[in-house]
Curated annotation (Swiss-Prot):
PROSITE patterns (UniProt xref): RHODANESE_3
EC number, UniProt record: 1.14.-.-
Protein name: tRNA uridine(34) hydroxylase
UniProt entry tagged with the keyword Oxidoreductase: yes
Gene encoding the protein: trhO
Domain Rhodanese: from-to ranges: 125-221
UniProt keyword terms in alphabetical order: Oxidoreductase, tRNA processing
Gene Ontology terms, MF aspect: oxidoreductase activity, acting on paired donors, with incorporation or reduction of molecular oxygen
Family: Belongs to the TrhO family.
Length: 320
């Protein structure tokens, strides 16, 4: 019997000038004290980028608390229900960059936000803009908008090179682009990067895939959504989601992610149950023979984003 969804999972971001982000980190930690909340929240002089989960009453209190702060009073939240917390711990940190791009971008020159309804209408046009998925390759393998251009990038930093190559393949002044990501924040930066490369007409999906699923359902979407927490994949709406991913080893239809058991690889990949047992949780035979391999137990599927000392308590070097 399915457990009742008594928790909220929140996704949110907001670009705003924060004079003392370290103080905001302290304020968050003080507010979270004695509350049933787990999180991955980053603050900088640029603003906030957050994901958190907690009991409904705690999540609602947090949203009310943030909206009472003039810095965040207009910030929208994207909300999913769940039956438990989805992060391994409570993390609130200062970060110099809200998104790792290593490129100066002009936040006054970003793409035009379009609502999920406007996005759907654009997708249904006979001649629509170039549809661009700006997530990592391992993310779009399990789900994407139908007909999207999906760059084979493993990190967000690689998109700069992709943008430079794209403008040699199409006319940037005559090629409109509609881009999307999970929750919207990567599009803020990447749309600015595209404009810097000379693209004149750039649209970005407001609130990302999460918001589209909440407002428009699964129309024009294929598969599931990769998320950066212990759920790993979720349907974007209540509608059934077809499996479009395939096993890294045998190519059979699959949507289950694993981190390679070789701690020096830790590659995130899709794998079926047969192959994960055959390769003992590793992405290749070389990794099986590596010196730092997590123990594989078929009844104890490894959750993502765990450090070595989670498995080897005496491994002090990994805690450095």
């Amino acid at each position: 019997m399915a457990q009742e969804p008594s928790f909220f999972v929140l996704a949110y971001y907001h670009f705003t000038a924060i004079a003392d982000p370290h103080q905001e980190v302290k304020a968050h930690k003080e507010f979270f004290k004695d509350r049933n909340i787990t999180s991955r929240i980053y603050l900088s002089e640029q603003g906030i980028n957050g994901q958190m989960s907690g009991k409904r009453e705690d999540a609602e209190a947090y949203m009310k608390w943030l909206h009472a702060n003039p810095l965040f009073e207009t910030m929208p939240f994207k909300i999913h229900s769940h039956h438990e917390n989805v992060f391994p711990r409570q993390t609130v940190k200062y970060r110099k960059q809200l998104v790792a791009l290593d490129e100066d971008v002009d936040m006054n020159q970003t793409g035009q936000h379009i609502s999920p309804l406007e996005w759907k209408e654009l997708l249904e046009k006979e001649k629509r803009p170039l549809l661009l998925d700006v997530r990592n390759e391992y993310e779009w393998q399990v789900g994407r908008f139908d007909g999207a251009e999906c760059p084979p990038c493993d990190t967000f930093r690689e998109f700069k090179e992709y943008a430079e190559n794209l403008k040699t393949q199409v006319n940037p002044e005559q090629t409109p682009i509609m881009m999307y990501c999970t929750g919207g924040i990567r599009c803020e930066l990447y749309s600015s990067l595209l404009k810097k490369e000379g693209f004149k007409e750039v649209y970005q999906l407001e609130g990302g895939i999460i918001n589209y699923g909440l407002k428009q359902g699964s129309e024009h979407w294929l598969g599931k959504l990769f998320v950066f927490d212990d759920r790993l994949t979720i349907p974007i709406s209540q509608e059934p989601a077809p499996v479009i991913g395939s096993c890294h080893h045998c190519q059979t239809s699959n949507e289950t992610y694993y981190n390679c058991a070789n701690m020096d690889c830790n590659h995130l990949y899709l794998c079926c149950q047969t192959c994960v047992e055959k390769f003992l949780g590793c992405c290749c035979t070389d990794c099986q023979n590596a010196p730092r391999v997590r123990p594989y137990h078929h009844q104890d599927v490894h959750k993502p984003f765990r450090k070595r000392h989670h498995y080897f308590k005496d491994d002090l070097t990994s805690k450095q």
